[in-house]
Curated annotation (Swiss-Prot):
The keyword Ribosomal protein applies. One of its GO terms (molecular function) is structural constituent of ribosome. The lineage of its organism: Bacteria, Bacillati, Bacillota, Clostridia, Eubacteriales. This is Large ribosomal subunit protein bL36. Belongs to the bacterial ribosomal protein bL36 family. InterPro entries: Ribosomal_bL36, Ribosomal_bL36_sp. It comes from Acetivibrio thermocellus (strain ATCC 27405 / DSM 1237 / JCM 9322 / NBRC 103400 / NCIMB 10682 / NRRL B-4536 / VPI 7372) (Clostridium thermocellum).
Amino acid sequence: MKVRPSVKVICEKCKIIRRKGRVMVICQNPKHKQRQG
């Protein structure tokens, strides 16, 4: 899980979702997991 000020889609399998007011990227590739904050 990378924590970044701006989350970006890295590949076509990445999805941007909102959980509890946080913007997150979920993906099949665990290296692409990101969270904003």
